[in-house]
C-alpha cells in the first residue's frame, strides 16, 4: 500500500487543533429492568454500580443468569431443546446449556443507564461541542445535568450529539440511557446486527467515546469522488457556520505541488461546497493488487474564529457494470467472497481496533478471498481502514433481515441507516457494494427495494448497489445475488449434483446466469459442515462459552466414540474441503458470473450450530485445511480442468479440457504444463499446452489432455496437476482394472440376506458377505438415516432433517480389506458410488465390541455409532456386513466392483479373522423384509 498526499487548506492566521476529552474508563451504572428510569429521573442522581467503558453489560458481568426462561433475541428455529428428553438435563438451572448457539453467562435485553461526571475546560467557551459514541448498541438517549439532549438509534455508524448549548465550562453530569430491545423498529431478530445467533444483542458502548470541541465555523463532512475517466477529483464539503452572520474564507487547494486559491462567503448555518481538482496523468489506482491510498487534509479557518482540520483517506477506483460483467478501473473483476456474520466469541461485539481487522482480513486473503459480505450488519471504521490498506472489497448491509415495504417503522429506519453508513464510511475505497440486508420479506418488497436502490444510485455513485442478498432479482440492481448458481440449496437434499450425479468437474451454472443481463454473484454457496473440534472449547475465555460443544461431546462420550473425535473432525473436514473446492471451481467455470459469497470461510456459531468453515469462529485453522491448499482453487489465477468423469477403468481413455480463470494481469505466452502422478509422486504422464495470451476473465480454454490408461494394471489413485506460470491446481482421479461382474462375484458367497444358503455356509465355518440392498436397512438400525456423498448442509436441526445426515467416511487406509481399493482415511470421489448406494448401519444395538472397517461419521447432534462395513463371527462362520448395495446395476459401477473385489480378496485371506460374535437373530434384525 502506498499513500499519496493531497492537501486542501482554508487560509488562517492561527492553527489550533480540535480538542477532545476521552470518556473511556469507569462509569456509574444501573440496570433499568422495569423501564422506570425516566419517570424516576435517574439522570438527576448518581447511579449505584460501576462498569468499564468501552464495554458491554456482558463484559462487565452485568445481567441475569441464563436459563430456560431467557428471552433471546433470535428465532428459535428448532425448539427441540425445550421439549426433547435428551436435553432435559441441560434445562436444569444448575447445568443449563443451550445447543443452538454460543452461550453467555449473563444476558440482558432492556434499558441500562451509564453515567459520569466531566469537566469542560475554560478554553472550550464559545466552541461547538460534540459527543461521539462509536458502536452504541442500540438506542441511546442523552441527558446533561438533567436536560435531555436527544435520541439516536443507528446500529452501524457512530452516534453523535451536538451538546454545545448544554456544556459550558465547568462540571457536568452525563447520563446515557441505552436500550437494546427490539421494539417498534424491527430489523429482524435474526439480523446479525442484533441477533444472539452471532454477536449477540449486547447493551453498551464499545468503541471510541469522547467529547470534541471545534470552532464555531467547522468542517462537518468531506466526500471525495474520484472521476477517473476525467482525471478529476470532485469534493463535496459541508461546512457549518454557527455564527449568526456570514463569514469570509479563502480556500487553497494544494495537489501535487500546485495551488489554486478561491474565496467563499459562508452563510450562517450549513454550507454545501463543491470543488473539482485535476488529478495527475499517472493515477495510482486502488484495487486488490495495488491498494494505493491518498490522504486529503482539509484545514479551515474563519476570521477571528479559529481553525478546524479534517483528514480523509480515499482511493482512486471506479466500478462499472457492462456486458453482464463487473469492472474495476476498466478491467474485469471477480468477487471471491466470504460472509462475515459478526461472531465475536470473546467480547460479543465487533472490535474497533484496526490491528484485529488486519489479522482477520489477511487470513481471508491468504485463503484467496478478495471480498467480504457483511451479512445484515455493517462493520466499524477500523474494518474499513484495514480493508483500504489491504485492497479488500466490502459489501455492506443496513443491519437488517426484515420484511420491508409494509409501511412499518423499519422502512424509514433503513433509509436513515443507509444514510448514516454512507456518511460515516463513504470515502473508503473498500466500501464497494451496498444492499438493504438479507433475504427480505414483505408483500411489497420488490417495489420498496426498487425505490431504495434507485434512490441510492442517484445519491452516491461511488459503489455498486443491489436490492438484497438472496432475492429479489430487480432490474434496478447493478448486480444480482441469488442462491441458484451453487451446488446445494435449501431443500435439495440428495438431488443436488454432488449427491445425485457421478463425480465430474465439467458442470457450471451458465444455464442460469445467461438468462440475466446483470452480473451474478452466487449467494451463500457452500454451507458444507465438518464435525466439531472439541479442543476449540478451551479458546472460549471471554463472555461466550461453547456449551453446545459440551452437549455434543457428552453424547459422543456416552456412545463410546470419544476416542474418534479428532479423527471425525479431520475426516469430515477433508470432505468439507472437497465440497468447497467443487463449489468454487464450478463458479470459476461459469460464464457471466461475477463472483461468489461463501458461507463460509469460518464457522457460524448459531442457528443450531453451523460448522461450515475451514476455519473456526476465531478465524483459526482446525487442522485439515491450510491457506496454501485452499488458495490453489480459490484465487485470482486458477487453472481448471473439465473432466466428465473421475473414475475410470483401464480400458478407457482419460480426458480433460483445460481452461483458466485469470483475474490478475494479461499473460502473454504463458507457460502451461500438466502432469499426472501416482500416489507416491511418480510422474506417469506430462505435457505442455500453449496459448498466445490469457486475457483477464474466465472460461479461457487452453487445450485438452488425453491418454490411454491400459498400462495401469492395478487399482490406483492418480493426480492431475496443471500449472500456469507456476500457479498450480490439481485433481484426484481413479483407475481400476476392468473387471466383469461375474469375475468379481466368484468365490465368497454374496447375499442380501441370511437365507438358507448363507446360513449353511456359516454353520460349516464358511465365509459370507452380507450386502444390504439399498432401502432394506431397518429403521431401528439406521434405515432412517439419509446418507449421501456430500457433507451435511448447514445443519440438520435448522433444515428440519435435510439430507444428507452424515459427514462422510472414516477408515484406516492400511486395513487389508481396502488394499485393492486405494483410499485415504476420508471420503473422496471414489467413495461416491458406495455412499450413493448404501445405508449407514447403526450398530450400537448389535454389540459393544464392533470395530467398523469403514465408519460413517454421524451428525454431531446424535453421534450414533455408524458403520458402512464391519465384520463379525456368526457361530463357526465369518460374516462381513456391508451397508453398501453390491447387487444393483453393478455393470455400470466400476468403483463398486473394485471395492467388492477388495473386500472379497480380504475375506479370502488369513487376515479375515473377526472376533466379535453375533447371533443370526440379531443380524436378521438389520433387514426390514426378512422372509
Each language-model region and where it sits:
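Short alpha-beta junction capping motif
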Residues: 746-792, 876, 903
Amino acid at each position: 500500500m502506498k499513500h499519496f498526499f493531497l492537501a486542501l487548506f482554508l487560509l488562517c492566521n492561527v492553527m489550533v487543533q480540535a480538542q477532545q476529552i476521552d470518556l473511556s474508563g469507569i462509569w456509574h451504572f444501573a440496570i433499568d429492568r422495569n423501564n422506570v428510569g425516566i419517570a424516576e429521573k435517574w439522570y438527576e442522581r448518581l447511579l449505584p454500580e460501576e462498569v468499564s467503558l468501552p464495554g458491554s453489560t456482558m463484559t462487565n458481568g452485568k445481567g441475569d443468569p441464563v436459563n430456560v426462561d431467557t428471552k433471546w433475541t433470535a428465532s428459535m428455529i428448532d425448539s427441540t431443546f425445550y421439549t426433547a428428553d435428551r436435553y432435559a438435563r441441560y434445562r436444569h438451572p444448575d447445568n443449563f446449556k443451550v445447543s443452538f448457539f454460543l452461550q453467555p453467562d449473563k444476558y440482558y435485553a432492556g434499558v441500562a443507564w451509564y453515567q459520569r461526571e466531566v469537566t469542560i475546560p475554560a478554553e472550550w467557551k464559545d466552541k461547538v461541542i460534540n459527543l461521539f459514541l462509536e458502536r452504541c448498541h442500540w438506542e441511546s438517549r442523552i441527558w446533561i445535568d438533567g436536560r435531555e439532549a436527544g435520541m439516536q438509534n443507528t446500529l452501524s455508524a457512530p452516534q453523535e450529539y451536538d451538546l454545545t448549548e448544554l456544556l459550558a465550562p465547568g462540571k457536568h453530569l452525563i447520563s446515557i440511557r441505552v436500550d437494546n430491545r427490539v421494539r417498534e423498529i424491527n430489523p429482524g431478530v435474526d439480523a446479525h446486527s442484533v441477533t444472539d445467533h452471532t454477536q449477540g444483542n449486547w447493551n453498551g458502548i464499545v468503541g471510541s467515546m469522547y467529547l470534541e470541541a471545534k470552532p464555531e465555523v467547522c468542517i462537518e463532512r468531506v466526500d471525495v469522488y474520484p472521476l477517473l475517466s476525467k482525471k478529476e477529483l470532485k469534493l463535496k464539503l459541508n461546512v457549518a457556520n454557527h455564527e449568526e452572520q456570514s463569514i469570509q474564507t479563502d480556500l487553497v487547494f494544494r495537489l501535487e505541488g500546485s495551488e489554486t486559491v478561491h474565496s467563499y462567503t459562508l452563510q450562517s448555518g450549513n454550507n454545501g461546497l463543491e470543488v473539482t481538482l485535476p488529478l495527475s496523468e499517472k493515477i495510482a489506482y486502488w484495487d486488490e493488487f495495488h491498494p494505493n491510498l491518498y490522504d486529503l487534509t482539509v484545514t479551515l479557518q474563519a476570521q477571528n474564529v479559529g481553525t478546524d482540520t479534517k483528514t480523509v483517506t480515499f482511493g482512486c477506483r471506479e466500478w462499472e457494470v457492462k456486458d453482464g460483467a463487473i469492472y474495476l478501473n476498466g478491467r474485469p473483476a471477480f468477487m471471491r467472497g466470504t460472509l462475515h456474520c459478526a461472531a465475536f466469541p470473546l467480547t460479543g461485539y465487533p472490535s474497533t481496533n484496526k490491528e484485529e481487522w488486519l489479522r482477520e482480513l489477511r487470513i481471508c486473503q491468504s485463503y484467496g478471498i478478495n471480498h467480504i459480505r457483511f451479512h445484515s450488519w455493517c462493520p466499524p471504521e477500523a474494518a474499513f481502514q484495514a480493508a483500504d490498506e489491504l485492497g479488500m472489497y466490502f459489501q455492506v448491509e443496513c443491519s437488517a433481515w426484515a420484511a420491508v415495504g409494509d409501511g412499518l417503522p423499519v422502512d424509514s429506519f433503513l433509509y436513515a441507516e443507509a444514510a448514516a453508513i454512507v456518511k460515516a464510511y463513504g470515502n473508503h475505497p473498500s466500501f464497494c457494494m451496498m444492499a438493504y440486508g438479507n433475504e427480505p420479506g414483505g408483500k411489497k418488497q420488490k417495489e420498496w427495494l426498487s425505490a431504495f436502490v434507485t434512490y441510492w444510485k442517484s445519491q452516491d455513485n461511488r459503489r455498486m448497489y443491489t436490492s438484497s442478498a438472496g432475492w429479489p432479482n430487480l432490474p434496478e440492481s447493478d448486480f444480482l445475488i441469488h442462491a441458484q448458481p451453487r451446488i446445494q440449496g435449501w431443500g435439495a437434499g440428495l438431488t443436488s449434483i454432488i449427491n445425485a450425479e457421478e463425480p465430474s468437474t465439467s458442470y457450471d451454472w451458465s444455464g442460469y446466469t445467461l438468462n440475466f443481463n446483470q452480473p451474478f454473484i452466487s449467494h451463500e454457496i457452500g454451507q458444507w459442515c465438518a464435525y466439531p473440534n472439541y479442543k476449540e472449547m478451551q479458546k472460549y475465555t471471554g463472555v461466550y462459552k461453547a456449551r453446545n460443544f459440551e452437549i455434543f461431546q457428552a453424547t459422543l462420550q456416552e456412545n463410546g466414540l470419544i476416542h474418534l473425535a479428532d479423527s471425525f473432525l479431520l475426516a469430515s473436514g477433508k470432505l468439507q474441503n472437497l465440497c468447497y473446492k467443487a463449489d468454487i471451481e464450478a463458479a470459476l467455470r461459469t460464464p457471466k458470473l461475477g463472483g461468489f459469497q461463501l458461507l463460509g470461510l469460518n464457522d457460524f456459531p448459531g442457528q443450531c450450530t453451523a460448522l461450515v468453515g475451514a476455519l473456526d469462529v476465531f478465524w483459526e485453522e482446525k487442522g485439515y485445511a491450510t491457506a496454501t491448499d485452499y488458495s490453489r482453487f480459490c484465487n485470482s489465477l486458477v487453472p481448471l480442468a473439465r473432466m466428465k468423469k473421475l473414475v475410470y477403468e483401464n480400458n478407457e481413455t482419460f480426458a480433460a479440457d483445460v481452461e483458466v480463470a485469470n483475474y490478475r494481469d494479461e499473460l502473454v505466452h504463458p507457460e502451461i504444463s500438466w502432469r499426472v502422478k501416482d500416489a507416491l509422486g511418480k510422474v506417469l504422464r506430462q505435457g505442455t499446452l500453449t496459448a498466445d495470451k490469457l486475457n483477464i476473465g474466465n472460461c479461457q480454454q487452453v487445450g485438452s489432455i488425453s491418454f490411454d490408461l491400459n498400462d495401469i494394471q492395478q487399482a490406483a489413485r492418480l493426480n492431475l496437476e496443471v500449472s500456469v506460470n507456476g500457479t498450480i491446481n490439481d485433481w484426484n482421479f481413479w483407475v481400476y482394472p476392468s473387471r466383469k461382474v461375474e469375475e468379481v462375484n466368484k468365490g465368497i458367497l454374496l447375499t442380501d440376506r441370511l437365507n438358507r444358503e448363507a446360513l449353511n455356509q456359516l454353520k460349516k465355518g464358511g465365509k459370507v458377505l452380507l450386502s444390504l440392498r439399498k432401502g432394506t436397512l431397518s429403521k431401528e438400525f439406521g434405515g432412517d438415516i439419509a446418507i449421501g456423498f456430500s457433507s451435511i448442509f448447514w445443519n440438520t436441526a435448522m433444515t428440519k432433517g435435510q439430507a444428507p445426515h452424515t459427514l462422510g467416511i472414516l477408515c484406516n487406509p492400511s486395513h487389508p480389506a481396502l488394499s485393492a481399493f486405494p483410499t485415504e482415511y476420508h471420503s473422496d470421489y471414489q467413495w461416491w458410488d458406495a455412499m450413493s448406494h448404501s445405508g449407514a448401519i447403526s450398530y450400537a444395538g448389535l454389540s459393544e465390541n464392533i470395530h467398523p472397517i469403514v465408519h460413517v461419521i454421524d451428525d454431531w447432534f446424535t453421534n450414533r455409532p455408524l458403520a458402512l462395513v464391519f465384520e463379525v463371527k456368526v457361530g463357526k462362520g465369518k460374516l462381513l456386513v456391508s451397508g453398501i448395495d453390491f447387487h444393483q446395476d453393478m455393470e455400470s459401477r466400476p468403483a463398486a466392483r473394485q471395492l467388492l473385489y477388495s473386500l472379497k480378496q480380504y475375506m479370502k485371506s488369513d487376515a479375515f479373522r473377526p472376533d466379535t460374535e453375533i447371533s443370526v437373530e440379531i443380524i436378521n434384525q438389520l433387514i426390514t423384509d426378512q422372509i
